[in-house]
Amino acid sequence: MERMRRARNAVLVFYYVFTACGAVFCLRRDAAVYNLLLALAAFALPAVPFLLYRACRLRPVYLLEIVFDGFVLAAVPFASLFGGYDFVPYWDKILHFLSGFLFAVLGTAVYFSCKPGRRLERGDAFNAALYTWMFAMMSAVLWEIWEYFVSQFGADPQHVLTTGVGDTMQDMIVCTLGGLITAVSCWKYLRHLGEKRRKGLMMSLFEAYYSENIEKRP
């Protein structure tokens, strides 16, 4: 636990140094209000896990924070402030693909939080994996609905003018694929519960959250 806490702190230091450099780079290039808001959002987003801990009375899960900060770093400071979308091919699709993994793990946590007794059992393998996959797909759809809502105010986050529905469909497909891979990992994890097998990052993330905030919950 202490080692993970130190690792989380090191990641946060790197995140804020990287973000500060990205903010300076972005605002010197174009000091538009939109870019200023992006920079402020980049500095604020690492606080999301802490706010969730307080609001939901959860125990800290440092691995969760490390993974979350890594994803946000790739999505906002690197992609938006430094312009990663412009010089890394398919970076947007890579991020949507990775989001499928994260939303799927969240789905696994929701499944066992709602399950009576909240115990991990081999018999849950199929249902939990299916729920995990469906949760990731639902999240992809909701995100595209949000982007459509934003587009009503003049922006074009779905690139409708240049791709039609292509960008929207590709985003949902790659997120669904990431969710499917995590669902298979969830199925294997539960089918071989108790055996000494490699869990992979996503199931390790779920296990860390489960042990702190589901299993120990009264």
Where in this protein do the model-derived segments appear?
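Alpha-helical transmembrane segments of multi-pass membrane proteins
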Residues: 46-50, 71-76, 104, 135-143, ...
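Interfacial helix-loop-helix junctions of multi-pass membrane proteins
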Residues: 82-83, 87-92, 137-180
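Membrane-interfacial alpha-helical segments at the cytosolic side of multi-pass membrane proteins
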Residues: 99-115, 152-157, 176-189
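Membrane-interface helix caps and helix-loop-helix hairpins in membrane proteins
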Residues: 27-33, 58, 81-91
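Cytoplasmic-side transmembrane-helix entry/capping segments in multi-pass membrane proteins
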Residues: 37-40, 59-71, 93-96
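N-terminal membrane topogenic signal
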Residues: 1-14
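Membrane-interface helix-boundary motifs at transmembrane edges
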Residues: 2-3, 31-33, 51-64, 118-124
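Short, highly charged, low-complexity non-transmembrane loops/tails of multi-pass membrane proteins
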Residues: 193-218
